[in-house]
């Protein structure tokens, strides 16, 4: 199958979205699918204000359209709501192409932490973006419940796999440590709300 993934989040960013998409593309290729990615690396871009690692592609519509038409994907997935995602969404709707999207991060909370933007405005924009998709894939049941409570209707849970060649059980050397044991695994960023974890 020819599968196209459109994402505004890509290397050199280091985050779960990039890791998920890179692993997904690699595994789809191993299963015999032909995967094509549209990423900011293919476009002139500028750094996002307050987060320069995020590259915002400039005027991507024509190039995204030609890439989609040339590749003629049998499945098209729009992973992000940025300039590339918006261009791909518009192209799909204009040409009657079905597509899926994914919701990877607590974007409304992220915006509220960095800018004085009400959550209702962010959720309305996200409902508009993802509502046109055949399915909007989310990472967990709790995210699915949260989005459903905010009026999202076309949700599916996209479970993440574990690479057992990389992550495997170790000897139970920590069993004798005093309880409770808590650990945070992830990036240090304002949207991760690590303060709440540290106050446990």
PLM features per residue range, with description:
Residues 1-44:
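N-terminal subdomain of nucleotide-sugar transferases
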Residues 64-85, 95-100:
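Short N-terminal targeting/anchoring amphipathic segment
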Residues 123-170, 176-177, 184:
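Donor nucleotide-sugar binding/catalytic pocket of nucleotide-sugar-dependent glycosyltransferases
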